[in-house]
Amino acid sequence: MSVRVAAGPRLHFGFLNLSLARQRLYGSLGVALDEPQVAVSAERAESVVCSHDRAREHVERACHLLDVPGAAVTVESELPAHVGLGSGTQLALAVLAAVARVHGREPGVRAHAPSLGRGGRSGVGVAAFEAGGFVFDAGHPASQFTPERPERGEWTVPPVAARHEIPGDWRFLLVLPDAEPGKAGSEEDDSMRAVVENADPGLADRISSVVTDRVLPAVATGDVDTFGAGVAEVGRLNGAWYAGEQGGVYRPPAGDLVDVLEDTPAVTGAGQSSWGPAVYGVTDRERADAARDAGRRALAEAGVDGEVRVAEPRNVGARIRDD
């Protein structure tokens, strides 16, 4: 039996709080998108067979976690790495789900994600893989965390505090400039440590107000204009925390791209996803073509090459199919 697992990217709009002076640390917001996609296929095997270096590590860990002898895994397509779309989490969980399925095991995605090194700070990627939609996670008790990243497996994925179906006519502009990749690994850990050690708790209060007064009501009622403006403001306020680590409220060249998109009537809000360089714009089906044109214009005015696409929301989890 062969199994195929396909998952899409997620946008990460920012955190609710990065200060240890508040009761909860982190708490992230994001949405699941339908494209681009990562897809892996797997068959039973008595050992690990995988030519993709990163995926092979996940296959080995998955086999250990599930107590199975092996699997032959092929990566059919993958998300661009370290651009702010959550590629690492989606690949790791897709591999886990595929290996589990061919052996007739439950994947235990949420339980096993920490052992795969995923879901430590943000729970959006794991929740997006599970069920799609708009996700707001509860973060962690600040008393249990320090600025240091916990060892692999020594955490639980933040629980989902709120999830909503994203209206089917909403669209998300993706602008992926040809730029240096976003922070990851030890570099990301070092930057997050510096940010948490110095985070102004007052920003968390302002972000909380935006989330509760604008973002959550907007996604619940289908108000795309208020939602776009709200998540963009969450991103700007998060950028004040990160400015010293990424060279400004947005990392270059994301700021130039956001400026153009924010001046476009077809885009209700724009920002940087995670560490970038991916930039998003919130729009809808009717304005999608104009938003796409604005994305191309933004790249041209910034003097950089890149890719522009408009993605639909994904309100379901990863697709698992027996071939």
Where are these regions (language model features)?
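Short beta-strand
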Residues: 269-273, 310
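ATP-binding N-lobe of GHMP and related small-molecule kinases
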Residues: 1-83, 101-107, 314-323
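Conserved hydrophobic/aromatic beta-strand scaffold that supports enzyme active sites
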Residues: 4, 39, 134-136, 172-174, ...
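Small/polar glycine-rich anion-binding or flexible loop at a beta-alpha turn
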Residues: 248-250, 254, 272-281
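Short beta-strand segments
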Residues: 6-8, 32, 127-130, 174-178, ...
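Short beta-strand-to-loop capping motifs
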Residues: 42-44, 177, 281-285
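ATP-dependent small-molecule kinase catalytic core of the GHMP/sugar-kinase superfamily
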Residues: 21-24, 114-265, 286-323
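DPxDG-like acidic metal-binding loop motif
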Residues: 85-110, 126-141
